[in-house]
Amino acid sequence: MSVIKKPDLTDPKLRAKLAKGMGHNYYGEPAWPNDLLYVFPLTMLGTLTCIVGLSVLAPTQLGEPADPFNTPLEILPEWYFFPTFNLLRVLPNKLLGVLAMAAVPLGLITVPFIENVNKFQNPFRRPLASLTFIFGFFTAVWLGIGACVPIDKAISLGFW
């Protein structure tokens, strides 16, 4: 059984409609009333039900109240900002840190122009793009781990 209704091309009435260029309007399920009046509201109602159900069954836990006179020794950003936080923390000049962060997207923009190959080619046969990805991934992981250690061990991660 199929979800898609296939037209019967042996039907002479359908062949006449197709010859006039109007067959696509006369078979299958119409999109206008069904999608906009049934599928979309049902999806929104399901999403709203999930959100309300989760907020009722698993409310957020409140932490301890903030104390303005007792600040932590080191304030860390969210985990996805760890690499940029460590880059700004390790580089001696803040302008150099900002330029290093701006160089990342600029360097990624140049990769397709440097490696001029077919876009449908196997990614394992694109050595520059693969090496750029691997180098960037491991650098981001290294900088992210380094943000969690003290600044004197941020570069070496305590290995040397």
UniProtKB/Swiss-Prot annotation:
Location relative to the cell: Plastid, Chloroplast thylakoid membrane
Topology class, membrane: Multi-pass membrane protein
Listed transmembrane segments: 36-56, 95-115, 131-151
Main subcellular location of this protein, as a coarse class: plastid
A Pfam family assignment: Cytochrom_B_C
An annotated Gene Ontology molecular function: electron transporter, transferring electrons within cytochrome b6/f complex of photosystem II activity
Gene3D superfamilies attached to this UniProt entry: plastocyanin oxidoreductase, Single helix bin
Keyword Cell membrane in record: no
KW tRNA processing (keyword) present: no
Family annotation (InterPro entries): Cyt_b/b6_C, Cyt_b/b6_C_sf, Cyt_b6/f_cplx_suIV, Cytochrome_b_C_euk/bac
Domain of life: Eukaryota
UniProt KW keywords: Chloroplast, Electron transport, Membrane, Photosynthesis, Plastid, Thylakoid, Transmembrane, Transmembrane helix, Transport
GO terms under cellular component: chloroplast thylakoid membrane
One annotated GO biological process: photosynthetic electron transport chain
Function: Component of the cytochrome b6-f complex, which mediates electron transfer between photosystem II (PSII) and photosystem I (PSI), cyclic electron flow around PSI, and state transitions.
PANTHER family: CYTOCHROME B
NCBIfam families with a match to the protein in the record: cytb6_f_IV (TIGR01156)
Family designation: Belongs to the cytochrome b family. PetD subfamily.
Subunit relationships: The 4 large subunits of the cytochrome b6-f complex are cytochrome b6, subunit IV (17 kDa polypeptide, petD), cytochrome f and the Rieske protein, while the 4 small subunits are petG, petL, petM and petN. The complex functions as a dimer.
Listed name of the protein: Cytochrome b6-f complex subunit 4
